[in-house]
Amino acid sequence: MRIIRPKKLKVGDLVTVVSPSQPVASRRNFKRGIRTLESLGLEVIPSKNVEAVFGMYEAGTAQQRAADLNEAFANDEVKAIFMSGGGFLANKVLPLLDYELIRKNPKIIIGFSDGATLLNAIFAKTGLITFHGFSVEHFFKRSTPYTVDSFLKIVEEGGVEFRPRTNWRILKGGRATGRLLGGNLLSFVNLLGTSYCPDLRRSILFFEEHDDYSEDVENSLTRLINAEILAGDYVQGIIFGKLVNIGLGSNDPDTKQWKKPKGFTMYQILKRRFEPYQIPILANVDFGLINTSLTIPIGIEAVMDTTKHQTRPFLKLTQPAVR
């Protein structure tokens, strides 16, 4: 597959906002997020159905959501597409997208949470580099200098390095080169076995998860392991971001009677699940449902180095994600 790098974003560019999953939860926060984008010198025009509601938890019908995305890619004046928020059911949109249109009209598309469903599927179907970062509705909360700097360095300047803000944690040492794929863990594993899942050969996976229980996270990890992609020419390394608001245990009330083992943590779970695999594992990286989050491109090649000689874990793109 030919890799397509979108054009750099520039001050004065016209951008749009779509809602591929759940409806806008807070109109006030949504408007504040738009103002944050405007403060960066961008002209923002929301899509036609961005504030639509269908049923109890969808931002319009799947047809409406797909139409907004297809129209955004078809509009030559639009230079980037942002997602309003996350949620679920972006997967209903996947069969309705015009991937040939997207391939012929490449542009920046950035999202978070369930948006990872679209980001990985679009890369898988077209080769277009996409971007995992933030949602507009939450951007005003996450518009810290670190978040904004990371976003601008990747999409405007063509930066290739990721600067740690906190202490990244090495769970397993090693060095790997591969194509960055991932985003939200559950959204990604839901793509496994479908035509919307990217080719996982020579890949480095990166995951965030939030507002869940460790049992559910481990279930998603097990689905990943059972796909038999953690050996040979497939996954070369795994990066975990911040695991936010993950309750230890299960959401099943019948399990509340069971005592938590001493020292039981998410890090312990990650170490245990990936112990048999000889690939580097990095955790606590600065991305996820936090107010200081990196923008990470999906589909571009990167190098991760967690060997002992490194004073700090190292992550770098082999080339810019934009042109």
Regions found by a protein language model. Give the residues of each.
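Conserved beta-alpha junction segments in alpha/beta enzyme cores
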Residues: 24, 28-29, 175, 179-212
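ATP/NTP phosphate-donor binding region
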Residues: 1-77
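ATP/nucleoside-binding phosphotransfer catalytic cores, i.e., glycine-rich phosphate-binding loops
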Residues: 242-323
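Short acidic/histidine-rich motifs immediately flanking catalytic phosphotransfer sites
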Residues: 75-79, 234-235
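N-terminal glycine-rich "phosphate-gripper" loop used for MgATP/nucleotide binding
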Residues: 80-91
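Internal helical hairpin/lid segments
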Residues: 199-265
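Short, acidic/small-residue loops that bind anionic groups at enzyme active sites
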Residues: 97-121, 129-135, 280
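Conserved anion/nucleotide-ligand pocket segment
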Residues: 127-193
